[in-house]
Amino acid sequence: MVYKSIDDYKMVVHNSSIIINHCKLTDFPTLIRQFGVWDKVCHRVNYIGIHYDPEKQRLFLPRGIDVDYVRRKVESTMDPDEFSSYIARYNHYDKVSKRIRMKMLPRDDVQKEALNFGLCKGKYYCNSGKTQFAINLTTGKGKTYIASCIMSYLGIRSIVITSQSGILDQWREKIKEYTDIDDSEIVKIEGGPMIGRILNDSSMMANKSLYLCTHSTLQTYGSTHGWDKVGLLFEKLGIGIKFFDEAHQNFQNMALIDFATRDVWRTYYITATPSRSDRQEDIIYKLYMKNVPSINLFNPEVDAHTSYIEIK
């Protein structure tokens, strides 16, 4: 069989998503069931951490789950001779407009360890071929500094995604404090009209190095105009690295962004709380991150760390 496009393959593995083409949501009941959360108010099952596109008959799954497990589930529904898979390694991105240099060295061994992990140095070299990284670091230990160093060292256009606009402003000021980046090289993407203008003329964003955006901005635009437009936005901006601040928050939206921007070279999930407060959601969150290389830099004797107790 001759495959004319990537969509002709049954299973496609991207940098931050696995896509099953030409399928129905009911084709893989045991697989889908793992992502179900019982809604006590509406008395129904809601699915998080996955997405199904009924128009194109495509199922989006997290890249962090076992690929072989997914393959077996898909193969069980069809003739093995008809199964086909493809690993997509596009890695199209732009370099920063000019070199970004750090103003200060890591302040302690925790930051050094986080940087070695995030940059796949030393004992973490084995992760060089990976595309997703989870850095679990206590608040106040320098999440913004770590992200700044990674962006500076790799020299690739990046985006920081947070839950609130005010937090983006804090990121902006901290990054300028830690690096020599010029304020004009940082762009805060606000509102659908701005995204529309970028999609119509991406040259207006030429010579930029860092983009800042909230979950709600991307969620609103994706829900209104289609999530493929969010993927196109990242492509037009030449983004090669995305940072999710407090990755455990806005979990489903984070998943949808990962699926839409599945060919972004690297994704960093940075959080001080690598878990969800709801027990069912926490199980799915951990499944989402199952095979994502992660590092926990918490010191239980020193660091104040949040523990959740579910009250039923």
What is each PLM-predicted segment?
Residues 241, 246-308:
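Post-DEXD/H (motif II) to motif III coupling segment of the RecA-like Helicase ATP-binding lobe
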Residues 181-198:
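Conserved RecA-like helicase motor-core motifs
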Residues 135-137, 246:
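The Walker A (P-loop) glycine that initiates the GxxxxGKT/S ATP-binding motif of P-loop NTPases
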Residues 76-135:
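Conserved pre-motif I regulatory segment
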Residues 139-178, 217, 276:
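Conserved Walker A/P-loop ATP-binding site and its immediately adjacent core
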Residues 193-238, 252-257:
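Conserved helix/coil segment N-terminal to the catalytic DExD/H
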Residues 1-80:
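N-terminal accessory nucleic-acid engagement/regulatory domains that precede
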Residues 157, 207-210, 238-241, 263-268:
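Loop/turn-to-beta-strand initiation segments
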